[in-house]
């Protein structure tokens, strides 16, 4: 029995051996991890709400000396999906009667990925369809009653230009997100001057701040430690954070960027640089914060579209920071504003 236990403990998916009465004779470590209430000698009730679906299947398989498989979804709040495979084994050592060997493959991550992909396609379709519908309506109007009206033509052409710009921004952000995700597993290796990257990002948004009547305040420690990073990617992340702060701050408000060495108790747990962008906007309800980095998620959908937002900016920021082995934290107070802080690990010194 000990040798059999060692063998199944080396299998990464949950494995159980059931006797004729469908009691658990043997289970591996992965099974105990997936089903915390599992006990050797207990029945299927220790599998929680799974047992109602598979009890009869197991009995039929044992009676027929055959094999079977079934996919089930649990009734838990956070549903899990399992592919359960069962096979009758005869003359197994230490088991004089026919037994069932059962494996559980957790399909939940694949199920979630499929759902996210479907949602993503639906969102992209909606985001593109809306401006196309608007442009189609403007063209129809220009071809009809407004064709001889210069003022109306100017108005509708301006609106069409705005919708085209919106689609252009959407396609640009989709391409950026796709590129970042494709490179996410490969952490940058080259040292990067954080101060220069911050300076580049500030220069890129200065004109927008002036146009919107916002003040930029900068507090950056000179000669910050180097990180391992890609300048264009990190600059894109900082520009996205700064543009959001500029767009959502109140009229005449101030956007503050600060960058310092992170304290020892920072979320990364090691030497790091933290770059914080603070705005004086309306703030974000606490319940909305966990979803801010989801694709196409907007707290105020109408306002986001009015300022040309695609709903992808913070998703891009998150994936860029993940590639740099960093992370983003968000703090906000309704009525006062928000602070977005990027933490980036400091590059380890090369031994000589």
Show where each model-derived region lies:
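PAS-family sensory domains
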Residues: 2-73
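PAS-family sensory/regulatory modules and their coupling/dimerization elements
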Residues: 43-109
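Short alpha-helical segment of the dimerization/phosphotransfer core of two-component systems
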Residues: 162-167
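Conserved micro-motifs of the catalytic ATP-binding
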Residues: 182-187, 226-229
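Conserved catalytic submotifs in the C-terminal HATPase_c
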Residues: 188-191, 210, 215-225, 262
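Short helix N-cap motif at coil->helix boundaries in the Bergerat
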Residues: 194, 283-291
């Amino acid at each position: 029995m000990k040798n059999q236990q060692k063998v199944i403990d080396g299998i990464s998916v949950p494995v159980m051996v059931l006797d004729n009465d469908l009691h658990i004779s043997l289970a591996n470590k992965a099974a105990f991890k997936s089903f915390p209430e599992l006990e050797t000698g207990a029945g299927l009730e220790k599998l929680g709400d799974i047992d109602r679906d598979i009890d009869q299947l197991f009995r039929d398989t044992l009676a027929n000396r055959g094999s079977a498989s079934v996919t089930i979804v649990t009734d838990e709040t956070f549903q899990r999906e399992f592919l359960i495979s069962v096979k009758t084994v005869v003359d197994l050592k230490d088991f004089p009667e026919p037994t069932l060997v059962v494996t559980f493959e957790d399909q939940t991550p694949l199920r979630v990925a499929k759902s996210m992909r479907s949602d993503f396609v639906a969102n992209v379709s909606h985001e593109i369809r809306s401006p196309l519908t608007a442009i189609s309506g403007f063209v129809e109007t220009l071809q009809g009653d407004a064709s001889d009206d210069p003022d109306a033509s100017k108005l509708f052409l301006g609106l069409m230009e705005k919708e085209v710009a919106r689609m252009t921004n959407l396609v640009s952000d989709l391409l950026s997100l796709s590129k970042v995700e494709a490179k996410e597993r490969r952490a940058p290796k080259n040292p990067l001057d954080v101060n220069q990257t911050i300076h580049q990002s500030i220069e890129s948004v200065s004109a927008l701040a002036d146009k919107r009547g916002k003040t930029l305040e900068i507090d950056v420690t000179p000669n910050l430690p180097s990180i391992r990073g890609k300048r264009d990617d990190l600059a894109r992340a900082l520009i996205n954070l700064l543009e959001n702060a500029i767009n959502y701050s109140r009229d005449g408000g101030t956007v503050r960027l600060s960058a310092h060495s992170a304290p020892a108790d920072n979320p990364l747990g090691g030497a790091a640089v933290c770059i914080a962008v603070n705005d004086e906007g309306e703030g974000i309800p606490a319940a909305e914060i966990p979803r801010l980095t989801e694709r196409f998620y907007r707290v105020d959908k109408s306002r986001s579209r009015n300022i040309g937002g695609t709903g992808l900016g913070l998703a891009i920021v998150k994936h860029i920071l993940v590639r740099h082995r960093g992370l983003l934290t968000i703090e906000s107070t309704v009525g006062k504003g928000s602070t977005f802080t990027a933490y980036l690990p400091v590059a380890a010194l090369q031994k000589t």
